[in-house]
Every structure is written in C-alpha cells, then in structure tokens.
Amino acid sequence: MIPVSLVVVVVGGWTAVYLTDLVLKSSVYFKHSYEDWLENNGLSISPFHIRWQTAVFNRAFYSWGRRKARMLYQWFNFGMVFGVIAMFSSFFLLGKTLIQTLGQMMADSSYSSSSSSSSHSSSSSSSSSSSSSLYNEQVLQVVVPGINLPVNQLTYFFAAVLISGVVHEIGHGIAAIREQVRFNGFGIFLFIIYPGAFVDLFTTHLQLISPVQQLRIFCAGIWHNFILALLGILALILLPVILLPFYYTGVGVLITEVAEDSPAIGPRGLFVGDLVTHLQDCPVTNVQDWNECLDTITYEPQIGYCISASTLQQLSFPVRAYKRLDGSTECCNNHSLTDVCFSYRNNFNKRLHTCLPARKAVEATQVCRTNKDCKKSSSSSFCIIPSLETHTRLIKVKHPPQIDMLYVGHPLHLHYTVSITSFIPRFKFLSIDLPVVVETFVKYLISLSGALAIVNAVPCFALDGQWILNSFLDATLTSVIGDNDVKDLIGFFILLGGSILLAANVALGLWMVTAR
C-alpha cells in the first residue's frame, strides 16, 4: 500500500501551490506583478505540474554543439543507428515482457486455486517462488513509490530520474545545435512527484532539415541515456578499485543496519559493524555470496550437525513428539527460546527425535547430511537435523570475534531485515554507509537511464519513438512509396501497435504491483 502520509503530503502540497497561484492571479493588487515575476523567471504553474525554463545555459549548449564538429557528427551517427535498432527491438522487448507478465498472472491464478483446494504446501511454495522469480527476471517493471519502491529510497529514485532526464535532453540539445536548429532554452519540470527536463527547439528549423538530420536529433536522447547506463555499469564494476584507498573487500560482509523487527536482533544477534564470514558452512566474502548462501539454505533441505553419542546422551532427555499441522515433528516446549527439536537415525537406522539445547548441540561441530558424514571424524557420532516447520531453518551465522548467532526462522526474513555491504572501512572515521549510498545510487541510475532509453524508443504517440519512426519512414520509404498518405498510414498503424503494447504492459504491470 502507498503510505497515506505520502499521499496527504503530495496532494496537500499541490493543492496549496495551485490555490496560491489561483489567488495571486485573481488578485487585483498582485495579478500583474505576479504574472510578470512568473514570466521573467520562466515559471508556469498548472494542476500537479510546475515548469521552469531558462536561456541561461544557451551559451553552454552552443559551445558544446559547435566544438569538434567532425567527432560530434560521428557520435550522433552512432546514436542514430542505435536509436533505429532500439526502436524495432523495443517491440520484441515489450512483447516478451507482456508474455512474462501474463505467465506470472496465470501462475498466481493457479497458485491461488491450488491453495484454496488444499494442495500440499511444498508444491504451492515452489509454484509461488517460481512465478515470483519469473516476474523478477523481467527487464522492464512498473515502479510505484511506496509499493515496490521503498519510501526510504525515494531520494535515490528521483535523483536518478532527474539526472537521466537532464542527460537525455542535453543529447537532444547538442544534436539540434549540431544540425543548425535554433535552441531556445532548457528547462526542468515537476509532474506530481516525478521530475524531468526538456529543451525548447525552434520547430520551423526542425521541420526544414532532412529526415536523416532529424533522426540524429531524435535519437540523441536515448543514445545519451544508453551511454550513461554503460558508464554506470563501468563505475559499479570499478567501485572496489575506486574506493580501494579507503575500503577493502573480499573478507566478508559488514552489517550496516538491522531492522527493529528483525529476528536477528538480540544479545547474541547481529549488530551494526559486525563482519559476517559464514552462513552455515557456506563462506561469505561479499554481498553476492551472502545472497547465494541464503538461496541455497532456503531451497535445500535443512543441514545437520555431528554430535558424539556421549554428548547426545548427556544433553537429551525423555520427550513426547507430536506432529505439527504442516507434517513436521515437534518434541520441545513451544515457548522454549533455547531448545530445538532434532531428528536423527540410531545404529539400527530408526528415526528418533530429541529435544536439545541448540547452542550446545551445534556449537563447534561439523555439518552433515547423514550419519556417514560424521563417521569420518568419530565412529560413535550421529547426524542430528533440526526438526522445524517446512520453510523454517536453523542457520549458524559466524561473525568473529563474537560468538556464533543461531538464527531460527525463514531465511528471507534475514535477507530483508539485515542490510549489508561488501566494503569494509580501513579507518574508523570512515562511514560504513558511504559505499552503500554510492552503490545504490549508481544502480538506480543504471536502471532508470536504461529504462528511459528503452521506453522512449518505443514507437508510441508522444514519445521520442514517434518522431524517430516518422523520420525513419521519411528517410526510407519516400523514394519507394510515392504516396505520402500510404506512408503516413503505415506509420500510424505502427504507432498504434506500439502504443497499445506499451499501454498493455503498463496496465498489467500496475495491476501486478498493486493487486498482489
């Protein structure tokens, strides 16, 4: 759900701005001075939309557009080729995304029906997880602040949107000046909560130049977004090298935040500044290892621990085992915070259950799957496996020099409530959050700049793709099809198809995000 406070602030803020604008424009005393002030500052206000335009940057744009003309010519030629390829590729990408979304909807529908008909929980879980992974693999996803975009990351999101938009429009502006089109100004706007940028070009000049020149201008925006995304990927890859004088990597993951409701909180839990090196027997050297280890723990059976027969006899006590609702076995007091029910096979291969103090049972022991794994170290040892609910795991988290944390719960809860980084500061005065901030922002910049390039390339009404398509058809079909009406009709149907495809993706994407 979108936070109510966010909606109240946005609607209340825009209402206040619009009413103030309306009152000042209706005032006998302030009307002329206020309108003059708006005009002099290049401001215009309408419901849920503020626009600012200036000619202050015109000299800079003209300087960029006239510098190294030959190099810019080649640069925008590359951009033109990329733009045309991207325009046609966007059809395939949107079609693939639409098929994936429909597949996800069908998977969710079958999962709901199987749940209502009392299917086995394991099969339902696998169906749900596979459909979720299918949705997460999509190249394009609808983003709604407060639903699938955390509120605490809105700053990254909107900053990346604004920078991507500015770079996009700078591309259009420089290309236009390079093609001798008059540049009137540059501006920034705010629509509801989304920021953006624009350039004001002299339309008559734009219509007089050749279709190929128009293509260079119209493709320049998405070309610059593509290059920005590539630079972001390069920066992300080189980030460990860039930060090497101040931060090192490859020895574990550093805890940067533990949520207040995290199961990892406690006297023997995780704390900010702890360095995690292992999850069970899975070594952790970076964030990717952490995620892969948690995935392995989630989807593989619970691992066991070797315990000697003498220790088992000493720690265990008579218990009464019973079945849980999910079919697993419990043999400890439900309210116990230290004891866990373990299962094992004795020398006669009979499965038994015993309630043991978890820390004493698993501390300083090797992991195992069967008794054979334990016979290597001692002939009189057993492999005891925690008997937990279907999706619950006992995870031993190593974070030296502190004592190992024993986590009992769903691995995903650990994943979502504990924030980590691969970067460890070399000096105490350095912030552990700085690499996380830089890394997160660069990832948003890559995603949003790339998305802006893809979406704007779609031959859809009111997007760059419309003008790219029109110029492309003018450049290629004018000599083939003499009748302009036929050419325009072809363009119209392509635009209609692209618009329907994009609208379907957005509508179904919104439904998937808000209705799940």
From Swiss-Prot:
PROSITE patterns named in the record: ZINC_PROTEASE
Biological processes, Gene Ontology terms: bone maturation; cholesterol metabolic process; membrane protein intracellular domain proteolysis; mitotic G2 DNA damage checkpoint signaling; positive regulation of cholesterol biosynthetic process; positive regulation of transcription by RNA polymerase II; protein maturation; regulation of response to endoplasmic reticulum stress
Record's cofactor remark: Binds 1 zinc ion per subunit.
Names of the cofactor(s): Zn(2+)
InterPro entries, alphabetized: MBTPS2, PDZ_sf, Peptidase_M50
Lumenal compartment residues: 25-74, 108-141, 249-443, 474-489
Record keyword Transport present: no
Ranges that cross the membrane: 4-24, 75-95, 96-107, 142-166, 171-183, 184-206, 226-248, 444-461, 462-473, 490-510
Keywords of the record: Cholesterol metabolism, Cytoplasm, Glycoprotein, Golgi apparatus, Hydrolase, Lipid metabolism, Membrane, Metal-binding, Metalloprotease, Protease, Steroid metabolism, Sterol metabolism, Transmembrane, Transmembrane helix, Zinc
GO MF annotations in UniProt: metal ion binding; metalloendopeptidase activity; transcription regulator activator activity
Record topological domains on the Cytoplasmic side: 1-3, 511-516
CDD domains noted in UniProt: cpPDZ_MBTPS2-like, S2P-M50_PDZ_SREBP
Places the protein is found: Membrane; Cytoplasm; Golgi apparatus membrane
Keyword Hydrolase among record annotations: yes
Catalytic activity: Cleaves several transcription factors that are type-2 transmembrane proteins within membrane-spanning domains. Known substrates include sterol regulatory element-binding protein (SREBP) -1, SREBP-2 and forms of the transcriptional activator ATF6. SREBP-2 is cleaved at the site 477-DRSRILL-|-CVLTFLCLSFNPLTSLLQWGGA-505. The residues Asn-Pro, 11 residues distal to the site of cleavage in the membrane-spanning domain, are important for cleavage by S2P endopeptidase. Replacement of either of these residues does not prevent cleavage, but there is no cleavage if both of these residues are replaced
Main location: membrane
Residues that, per the record, bind Zn(2+): H168, H172
Residues carrying sugar: N334
Annotated EC: 3.4.24.85
Topological category with respect to the lipid bilayer: Multi-pass membrane protein
GO cellular component, one term: Golgi membrane
Stored Pfam families: Peptidase_M50 (PF02163)
Family membership noted in the UniProt record: Belongs to the peptidase M50A family.
UniProt-recorded name of the protein: Membrane-bound transcription factor site-2 protease
Source organism per UniProt: Bos taurus
Upper taxonomic lineage: Eukaryota, Metazoa, Chordata, Craniata, Vertebrata
Gene name per UniProt: MBTPS2
